[in-house]
Regions:
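Hydrophobic positions on the alpha1 helix immediately C-terminal to the Walker A/P-loop
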Residues: 52
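Conserved lysine of the Walker
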Residues: 49
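P-loop (Walker A) phosphate-binding loop of NTP-binding proteins
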Residues: 44
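Short beta-strand-centered segment that lines the nucleotide-binding/catalytic pocket of NTP-utilizing
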Residues: 62-77
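ATP-dependent NMP and nucleoside kinases share a basic, alpha-helical "lid"
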Residues: 126-178
């Protein structure tokens, strides 16, 4: 554990070495059965966690399956669009943790799963699904993935990305306006009424469960160290 503080590269090396030693027997057993090694990447909205996870996926495209927690928001077919836009999407109650756990267990058992797809322009799940394959490494990223004990217990390595609040809100505003068709006023209103208070209440406290806390999602030294850890896990499959 990191006691809620960002770690230096040297400390990060020691943590990775500790994690490697702690999980060596379990990892070997899983490799024999080709069961995936599951890495959770959490952090506040706009922290850079998805960017970090995406870079890892790009580094090992055939060996990593990436799951976004955002796709597991609950359905709200019975609520009008205007009202759905005002719902609190940053509280644990907004997510279907049980489905996440169920599908991770299926992946660990070598079974592909059909992951739901959330449509942020409609504030609801779409009718589409994404097939996720049981590759050697499963990455799951999301703001609240360390909140649920059952989901947390599915993970072999937990990483929390900590980023300055000003930087997070700027990233979120840019993303929501460009990718999700939002206007600036709605982004600011949502941030002040739900995103910020829920981050302080639910998201930030979960960093105590992290094995590693990174200072920013663009931390190149940390990326290279985690990448090396993944490479070692993959080598043990050979």
């Amino acid at each position: 554990m990191c006691d809620g503080k960002p770690v230096s590269p040297l400390t990060l090396c020691r943590i990775l070495e500790y994690t490697r030693e702690k999980d060596s027997t379990r990892t070997k057993d899983r490799c024999l059965g080709m069961k995936p090694y599951i890495i959770g990447i959490a952090g506040g909205s706009g922290s850079g966690k998805s960017t970090f996870a995406g870079r890892l996926k790009e580094a090992f495209p055939e060996s990593i399956s990436l799951i976004s927690c955002d796709n597991y928001y609950l359905r709200h077919d019975d609520i009008p669009l205007a009202e759905r836009a005002l719902l609190n999407y940053d509280a644990p109650e907004a997510l279907e943790f049980s489905l996440m756990v169920q599908q991770l267990e299926q992946l660990k058992n070598g079974q592909p799963v059909l992951c739901p797809v959330y449509d942020f322009t409609l504030h609801n799940r779409s009718d589409k699904v994404i097939e996720i394959l049981p590759r050697p490494i499963i990455l799951i990223d999301g703001i609240l993935i360390f909140h649920d004990p059952a989901l947390r217990n599915c993970m072999d390595l937990k990483i929390y990305v900590e980023t300055d609040a000003d930087e997070r809100i700027l990233r979120r505003a840019r993303r929501d306006m460009v990718e999700r068709g939002r206007d600036l006023d709605s982004v600011i209103h949502q941030y002040l009424t739900t995103v910020k208070p829920m981050h302080n209440t639910y998201v930030n406290p979960t960093k105590v469960f992290a094995d590693i806390i990174l200072n920013g999602g663009k931390n190149e030294q940390a990326f290279q160290l985690v990448k090396a850890q993944i490479q070692q896990i993959l080598d043990s499959h050979k």
